[in-house]
Protein backbone atom coordinates (compact mmCIF):
# COMPACT_ATOMS: atom_id res chain seq x y z
CA UNK A 1 0.00 0.00 0.00
CA UNK A 2 1.37 3.40 -0.97
CA UNK A 3 2.52 5.49 1.97
CA UNK A 4 3.26 9.19 2.30
CA UNK A 5 4.89 11.06 5.17
CA UNK A 6 3.98 14.57 6.26
CA UNK A 7 6.92 16.99 6.30
CA UNK A 8 7.57 20.66 7.03
CA UNK A 9 10.02 22.63 4.87
CA UNK A 10 12.15 23.43 7.92
CA UNK A 11 12.70 19.70 8.43
CA UNK A 12 14.56 19.61 5.11
CA UNK A 13 16.03 23.06 4.46
CA UNK A 14 19.51 23.24 5.98
CA UNK A 15 19.76 19.48 6.54
CA UNK A 16 21.46 17.79 3.58
CA UNK A 17 20.55 14.32 4.84
CA UNK A 18 16.86 14.89 5.54
CA UNK A 19 15.38 14.09 2.15
CA UNK A 20 17.36 10.87 1.88
CA UNK A 21 16.32 9.79 5.37
CA UNK A 22 12.66 10.36 4.55
CA UNK A 23 12.94 8.43 1.29
CA UNK A 24 14.71 5.67 3.21
CA UNK A 25 11.62 5.13 5.35
CA UNK A 26 10.01 3.35 2.42
CA UNK A 27 7.43 6.01 1.64
CA UNK A 28 6.80 6.91 -2.00
CA UNK A 29 5.51 10.40 -1.35
CA UNK A 30 6.16 13.43 0.82
CA UNK A 31 3.19 15.61 1.73
CA UNK A 32 4.97 18.92 2.23
CA UNK A 33 3.42 21.92 3.98
CA UNK A 34 3.09 24.96 1.73
CA UNK A 35 0.60 26.95 3.85
CA UNK A 36 0.50 26.25 7.57
CA UNK A 37 -0.82 27.61 10.85
CA UNK A 38 1.21 28.77 13.84
CA UNK A 39 3.04 25.99 15.63
CA UNK A 40 5.99 25.05 17.80
CA UNK A 41 7.73 22.06 16.26
CA UNK A 42 10.53 19.74 17.30
CA UNK A 43 13.33 19.01 14.83
CA UNK A 44 15.27 16.22 16.59
CA UNK A 45 17.78 15.57 13.80
CA UNK A 46 18.40 18.98 12.24
CA UNK A 47 22.04 20.13 12.34
CA UNK A 48 21.15 23.77 13.10
CA UNK A 49 18.13 23.79 15.45
CA UNK A 50 15.90 21.70 17.67
CA UNK A 51 12.79 23.88 18.04
CA UNK A 52 11.09 25.85 15.28
CA UNK A 53 8.45 28.39 16.30
CA UNK A 54 6.12 29.52 13.53
CA UNK A 55 4.61 32.64 15.08
CA UNK A 56 1.55 32.87 12.84
CA UNK A 57 -0.21 31.24 9.93
CA UNK A 58 1.77 31.79 6.75
CA UNK A 59 2.57 30.57 3.29
CA UNK A 60 5.98 28.95 3.05
CA UNK A 61 6.86 30.32 -0.40
CA UNK A 62 6.96 33.83 -1.91
CA UNK A 63 3.45 35.32 -2.09
CA UNK A 64 2.18 36.26 -5.55
CA UNK A 65 1.61 39.95 -4.84
CA UNK A 66 -0.26 40.53 -8.11
CA UNK A 67 -2.91 38.01 -7.11
CA UNK A 68 -3.58 39.77 -3.82
CA UNK A 69 -3.15 43.43 -4.78
CA UNK A 70 -5.72 45.67 -3.12
CA UNK A 71 -7.26 42.92 -1.01
CA UNK A 72 -7.61 43.18 2.76
CA UNK A 73 -7.47 39.42 3.25
CA UNK A 74 -4.26 37.95 1.91
CA UNK A 75 -1.71 35.34 3.00
CA UNK A 76 1.01 36.30 5.44
CA UNK A 77 4.63 35.68 4.56
CA UNK A 78 6.56 33.40 6.88
CA UNK A 79 9.21 34.78 9.17
CA UNK A 80 12.61 33.33 9.96
CA UNK A 81 11.10 29.86 10.39
CA UNK A 82 10.62 29.52 6.60
CA UNK A 83 12.31 32.40 4.76
CA UNK A 84 12.22 32.87 1.00
CA UNK A 85 10.98 29.88 -0.94
CA UNK A 86 11.45 27.34 1.84
CA UNK A 87 8.75 25.14 0.34
CA UNK A 88 10.40 25.16 -3.09
CA UNK A 89 13.83 24.35 -1.69
CA UNK A 90 12.50 21.46 0.36
CA UNK A 91 10.36 20.16 -2.50
CA UNK A 92 13.37 20.11 -4.79
CA UNK A 93 15.43 18.10 -2.32
CA UNK A 94 12.63 15.60 -1.72
CA UNK A 95 12.04 15.12 -5.44
CA UNK A 96 15.75 14.64 -6.02
CA UNK A 97 15.65 11.88 -3.39
CA UNK A 98 13.08 10.09 -5.54
CA UNK A 99 9.88 11.08 -3.75
CA UNK A 100 6.66 12.33 -5.28
CA UNK A 101 5.85 15.67 -3.67
CA UNK A 102 2.30 16.80 -2.89
CA UNK A 103 1.41 20.06 -1.19
CA UNK A 104 -0.21 20.24 2.24
CA UNK A 105 -2.41 23.31 2.56
CA UNK A 106 -4.13 24.50 5.74
CA UNK A 107 -7.02 26.77 4.80
CA UNK A 108 -9.77 27.97 7.21
CA UNK A 109 -7.56 28.24 10.29
CA UNK A 110 -5.68 31.49 10.87
CA UNK A 111 -5.43 33.22 14.25
CA UNK A 112 -3.50 36.23 12.94
CA UNK A 113 -6.17 36.97 10.37
CA UNK A 114 -8.78 36.77 13.10
CA UNK A 115 -6.82 39.15 15.31
CA UNK A 116 -6.23 41.71 12.56
CA UNK A 117 -9.65 41.32 10.92
CA UNK A 118 -11.97 40.32 13.77
CA UNK A 119 -15.12 40.58 11.68
CA UNK A 120 -13.97 37.51 9.73
CA UNK A 121 -14.16 35.21 12.76
CA UNK A 122 -16.79 32.76 13.92
CA UNK A 123 -18.88 34.32 16.72
CA UNK A 124 -20.62 31.97 19.15
CA UNK A 125 -24.07 32.36 20.71
CA UNK A 126 -22.55 34.27 23.66
CA UNK A 127 -20.82 36.80 21.41
CA UNK A 128 -17.33 35.33 21.87
CA UNK A 129 -15.13 35.52 18.77
CA UNK A 130 -12.98 32.58 17.73
CA UNK A 131 -9.98 34.30 16.17
CA UNK A 132 -8.58 30.98 14.94
CA UNK A 133 -11.75 30.18 12.98
CA UNK A 134 -12.53 32.24 9.86
CA UNK A 135 -16.24 32.03 9.07
CA UNK A 136 -16.55 30.23 5.75
CA UNK A 137 -19.98 31.75 5.06
CA UNK A 138 -18.52 35.22 4.47
CA UNK A 139 -17.97 36.16 0.83
CA UNK A 140 -14.56 37.81 1.32
CA UNK A 141 -13.30 34.88 3.38
CA UNK A 142 -14.47 32.40 0.75
CA UNK A 143 -12.73 34.36 -2.01
CA UNK A 144 -9.54 34.42 0.07
CA UNK A 145 -9.70 30.67 0.70
CA UNK A 146 -10.25 29.84 -2.96
CA UNK A 147 -7.26 31.87 -4.11
CA UNK A 148 -5.08 30.65 -1.24
CA UNK A 149 -5.92 27.07 -2.17
CA UNK A 150 -4.97 27.64 -5.80
CA UNK A 151 -1.72 29.44 -5.00
CA UNK A 152 -0.57 27.13 -2.21
CA UNK A 153 -1.70 23.85 -3.76
CA UNK A 154 -0.39 24.20 -7.29
CA UNK A 155 3.29 24.75 -6.59
CA UNK A 156 5.95 24.00 -9.21
CA UNK A 157 6.59 20.27 -9.50
CA UNK A 158 3.80 19.22 -7.14
CA UNK A 159 1.82 16.20 -8.33
CA UNK A 160 -1.16 16.79 -6.06
CA UNK A 161 -2.41 18.45 -2.92
CA UNK A 162 -4.01 17.66 0.42
CA UNK A 163 -6.37 20.34 1.68
CA UNK A 164 -6.78 20.59 5.45
CA UNK A 165 -9.42 22.68 7.26
CA UNK A 166 -11.58 23.07 4.16
CA UNK A 167 -14.77 23.47 6.13
CA UNK A 168 -16.04 24.85 9.40
CA UNK A 169 -13.72 25.47 12.31
CA UNK A 170 -15.29 25.87 15.73
CA UNK A 171 -14.47 25.75 19.41
CA UNK A 172 -12.05 22.82 19.29
CA UNK A 173 -8.55 24.19 18.85
CA UNK A 174 -5.27 23.92 20.74
CA UNK A 175 -4.91 27.49 21.95
CA UNK A 176 -2.22 29.20 24.01
CA UNK A 177 -2.10 27.53 27.45
CA UNK A 178 -5.58 26.14 26.80
CA UNK A 179 -7.88 25.93 29.83
CA UNK A 180 -11.31 25.09 28.44
CA UNK A 181 -11.48 21.40 29.35
CA UNK A 182 -13.25 21.82 32.67
CA UNK A 183 -16.63 20.77 31.28
CA UNK A 184 -17.02 17.80 28.98
CA UNK A 185 -18.93 19.14 25.98
CA UNK A 186 -18.96 16.09 23.73
CA UNK A 187 -20.14 16.28 20.14
CA UNK A 188 -23.39 18.02 21.02
CA UNK A 189 -21.86 20.76 23.15
CA UNK A 190 -19.08 21.28 20.64
CA UNK A 191 -21.63 21.73 17.86
CA UNK A 192 -23.69 24.23 19.83
CA UNK A 193 -20.58 26.17 20.86
CA UNK A 194 -19.43 26.21 17.23
CA UNK A 195 -22.59 27.65 15.69
CA UNK A 196 -21.68 31.02 14.21
CA UNK A 197 -23.64 34.23 14.64
CA UNK A 198 -21.70 36.64 12.44
CA UNK A 199 -23.76 38.79 10.07
CA UNK A 200 -23.48 36.30 7.22
CA UNK A 201 -24.61 33.37 9.35
CA UNK A 202 -27.43 35.33 10.93
CA UNK A 203 -28.75 36.05 7.45
CA UNK A 204 -28.22 32.42 6.50
CA UNK A 205 -30.30 31.17 9.41
CA UNK A 206 -33.02 33.62 8.38
CA UNK A 207 -33.09 32.04 4.95
CA UNK A 208 -33.89 28.73 6.61
CA UNK A 209 -36.75 30.03 8.72
CA UNK A 210 -34.82 30.81 11.90
CA UNK A 211 -34.63 34.12 13.72
CA UNK A 212 -30.97 34.55 14.65
CA UNK A 213 -31.65 36.21 18.01
CA UNK A 214 -34.12 33.51 18.98
CA UNK A 215 -31.66 30.83 17.85
CA UNK A 216 -28.81 32.30 19.90
CA UNK A 217 -31.07 32.42 22.94
CA UNK A 218 -32.12 28.81 22.34
CA UNK A 219 -28.49 27.72 22.05
CA UNK A 220 -27.57 29.41 25.33
CA UNK A 221 -30.57 27.82 27.04
CA UNK A 222 -29.70 24.42 25.59
CA UNK A 223 -26.17 24.69 26.93
CA UNK A 224 -27.16 25.54 30.51
CA UNK A 225 -27.54 21.89 31.61
CA UNK A 226 -24.26 21.13 29.84
CA UNK A 227 -22.42 23.73 31.93
CA UNK A 228 -24.01 22.31 35.08
CA UNK A 229 -22.84 18.82 34.17
CA UNK A 230 -26.42 17.52 33.99
CA UNK A 231 -26.09 16.24 30.41
CA UNK A 232 -23.86 13.33 29.36
CA UNK A 233 -20.86 14.44 27.35
CA UNK A 234 -21.62 11.89 24.64
CA UNK A 235 -24.75 11.53 22.56
CA UNK A 236 -23.92 12.88 19.12
CA UNK A 237 -26.57 14.36 16.87
CA UNK A 238 -29.55 12.92 18.78
CA UNK A 239 -28.40 14.92 21.80
CA UNK A 240 -28.15 18.09 19.69
CA UNK A 241 -31.77 17.51 18.63
CA UNK A 242 -32.82 16.91 22.22
CA UNK A 243 -31.12 20.05 23.49
CA UNK A 244 -32.05 22.40 20.64
CA UNK A 245 -35.17 20.80 19.18
CA UNK A 246 -35.25 18.64 16.09
CA UNK A 247 -36.49 21.18 13.53
CA UNK A 248 -34.22 23.95 14.74
CA UNK A 249 -31.18 21.68 14.84
CA UNK A 250 -31.91 20.40 11.34
CA UNK A 251 -32.22 23.93 9.95
CA UNK A 252 -28.82 24.95 11.36
CA UNK A 253 -27.27 21.85 9.89
CA UNK A 254 -28.78 22.43 6.45
CA UNK A 255 -27.36 25.97 6.42
CA UNK A 256 -23.89 25.01 7.59
CA UNK A 257 -23.51 21.92 5.44
CA UNK A 258 -24.66 23.81 2.36
CA UNK A 259 -22.02 26.48 3.02
CA UNK A 260 -19.28 23.89 3.47
CA UNK A 261 -20.27 21.80 0.44
CA UNK A 262 -20.35 24.78 -1.90
CA UNK A 263 -16.96 25.99 -0.66
CA UNK A 264 -15.44 22.55 -1.12
CA UNK A 265 -16.85 22.31 -4.64
CA UNK A 266 -15.57 25.78 -5.54
CA UNK A 267 -12.09 25.23 -4.12
CA UNK A 268 -11.57 21.84 -5.73
CA UNK A 269 -12.76 23.14 -9.10
CA UNK A 270 -10.46 26.18 -8.88
CA UNK A 271 -7.43 24.07 -7.96
CA UNK A 272 -8.10 21.66 -10.82
CA UNK A 273 -8.50 24.53 -13.27
CA UNK A 274 -5.09 25.90 -12.27
CA UNK A 275 -3.29 22.55 -12.09
CA UNK A 276 -1.81 20.32 -14.79
CA UNK A 277 -3.70 17.26 -15.99
CA UNK A 278 -3.60 14.41 -13.48
CA UNK A 279 -3.07 16.65 -10.45
CA UNK A 280 -4.59 14.88 -7.44
CA UNK A 281 -6.83 16.74 -4.99
CA UNK A 282 -7.57 15.17 -1.59
CA UNK A 283 -9.35 16.56 1.47
CA UNK A 284 -8.61 15.88 5.11
CA UNK A 285 -12.07 14.71 6.10
CA UNK A 286 -14.33 13.42 8.86
CA UNK A 287 -17.36 11.37 7.76
CA UNK A 288 -19.61 13.02 10.38
CA UNK A 289 -20.83 16.00 8.41
CA UNK A 290 -21.58 18.31 11.35
CA UNK A 291 -18.08 17.98 12.85
CA UNK A 292 -15.68 20.93 12.75
CA UNK A 293 -11.91 21.16 12.60
CA UNK A 294 -8.83 20.29 10.62
CA UNK A 295 -10.57 17.19 9.29
CA UNK A 296 -13.62 18.89 7.85
CA UNK A 297 -16.98 17.24 8.40
CA UNK A 298 -18.27 16.01 5.03
CA UNK A 299 -20.95 13.89 3.46
CA UNK A 300 -18.90 10.92 2.18
CA UNK A 301 -20.89 10.42 -1.00
CA UNK A 302 -20.77 14.09 -1.89
CA UNK A 303 -17.09 14.67 -1.24
CA UNK A 304 -16.02 11.61 -3.22
CA UNK A 305 -17.98 13.01 -6.16
CA UNK A 306 -16.02 16.26 -5.85
CA UNK A 307 -12.43 15.40 -4.87
CA UNK A 308 -10.15 12.53 -5.85
CA UNK A 309 -10.30 11.15 -2.34
CA UNK A 310 -9.88 11.81 1.34
CA UNK A 311 -7.31 11.60 4.13
CA UNK A 312 -9.05 10.14 7.17
CA UNK A 313 -7.86 10.30 10.82
CA UNK A 314 -7.32 6.72 12.00
CA UNK A 315 -5.02 6.96 15.03
CA UNK A 316 -8.00 6.32 17.29
CA UNK A 317 -9.33 3.49 15.13
CA UNK A 318 -10.16 2.79 11.50
CA UNK A 319 -13.92 3.17 11.88
CA UNK A 320 -14.04 6.57 10.13
CA UNK A 321 -12.93 4.87 6.89
CA UNK A 322 -16.09 2.79 6.64
CA UNK A 323 -18.57 5.48 5.51
CA UNK A 324 -16.21 6.43 2.68
CA UNK A 325 -15.53 2.83 1.66
CA UNK A 326 -19.27 2.15 1.58
CA UNK A 327 -19.63 4.60 -1.32
CA UNK A 328 -18.09 2.00 -3.62
CA UNK A 329 -15.89 4.45 -5.54
CA UNK A 330 -13.03 2.18 -6.51
CA UNK A 331 -10.97 4.97 -8.09
CA UNK A 332 -11.11 7.20 -5.02
CA UNK A 333 -8.10 7.49 -2.74
CA UNK A 334 -8.93 6.54 0.84
CA UNK A 335 -5.82 7.37 2.84
CA UNK A 336 -5.67 6.23 6.45
CA UNK A 337 -3.79 8.83 8.50
CA UNK A 338 -1.82 7.47 11.46
CA UNK A 339 0.22 9.46 13.95
CA UNK A 340 3.59 7.72 14.26
CA UNK A 341 5.02 10.04 16.92
CA UNK A 342 4.87 8.14 20.22
CA UNK A 343 5.06 11.32 22.26
CA UNK A 344 1.99 12.69 20.48
CA UNK A 345 -0.22 9.67 21.03
CA UNK A 346 0.98 7.64 18.07
CA UNK A 347 1.86 3.96 18.02
CA UNK A 348 4.51 3.26 15.38
CA UNK A 349 5.15 -0.15 16.91
CA UNK A 350 1.67 -1.31 15.87
CA UNK A 351 1.76 0.26 12.41
CA UNK A 352 1.76 -3.07 10.58
CA UNK A 353 -1.39 -4.22 12.37
CA UNK A 354 -2.97 -0.78 12.06
CA UNK A 355 -2.27 -0.69 8.33
CA UNK A 356 -3.76 -4.15 7.89
CA UNK A 357 -6.93 -3.08 9.71
CA UNK A 358 -7.10 0.06 7.59
CA UNK A 359 -6.78 -1.95 4.38
CA UNK A 360 -9.53 -4.30 5.54
CA UNK A 361 -11.71 -1.24 6.17
CA UNK A 362 -11.13 0.04 2.65
CA UNK A 363 -8.00 2.18 2.82
CA UNK A 364 -5.94 2.32 -0.36
CA UNK A 365 -3.06 4.43 1.02
CA UNK A 366 -1.35 5.40 4.27
CA UNK A 367 -0.46 8.82 5.63
CA UNK A 368 2.14 9.00 8.37
CA UNK A 369 2.26 11.97 10.72
CA UNK A 370 5.03 13.07 10.94
CA UNK A 371 8.51 12.39 9.47
CA UNK A 372 10.05 15.52 10.95
CA UNK A 373 8.56 15.33 14.45
CA UNK A 374 9.14 11.63 15.15
CA UNK A 375 12.07 10.29 17.15
CA UNK A 376 14.70 8.02 15.62
CA UNK A 377 13.10 5.06 17.36
CA UNK A 378 9.69 5.90 15.95
CA UNK A 379 11.12 6.21 12.45
CA UNK A 380 12.99 2.92 12.83
CA UNK A 381 9.66 1.24 13.58
CA UNK A 382 8.08 2.82 10.51
CA UNK A 383 11.01 1.81 8.32
CA UNK A 384 10.78 -1.79 9.50
CA UNK A 385 7.11 -1.95 8.55
CA UNK A 386 7.53 -0.32 5.15
CA UNK A 387 10.83 -1.88 4.05
CA UNK A 388 11.26 -4.97 6.23
CA UNK A 389 13.82 -5.72 8.97
CA UNK A 390 17.33 -4.39 8.44
PLM segments and residue spans:
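Active-site-adjacent "subsite" loops/lids of carbohydrate-active enzymes
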Residues: 4-6, 102-156
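The substrate-binding groove and active-site-proximal loops of carbohydrate-active enzymes
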Residues: 4-12, 65-84, 128-143, 248-259, ...
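Short, acidic/polar
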Residues: 10-24, 139-152, 290-305, 321-322, ...
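Catalytic domains of carbohydrate-active enzymes, especially glycoside hydrolases
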Residues: 16-43, 151-160, 300-313, 360-364
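Glycine-rich, aromatic-flanked loop segments that form ligand/cofactor-binding clefts
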Residues: 31-56, 83-127, 160-170
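Polysaccharide-binding and catalytic clefts of secreted carbohydrate-active enzymes
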Residues: 129-270, 285-287, 293-300
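Substrate-binding cleft/loops of secretory-pathway carbohydrate-active enzymes
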Residues: 171, 273-318
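Substrate-binding cleft of secreted/luminal carbohydrate-active enzymes
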Residues: 307-321, 337-390
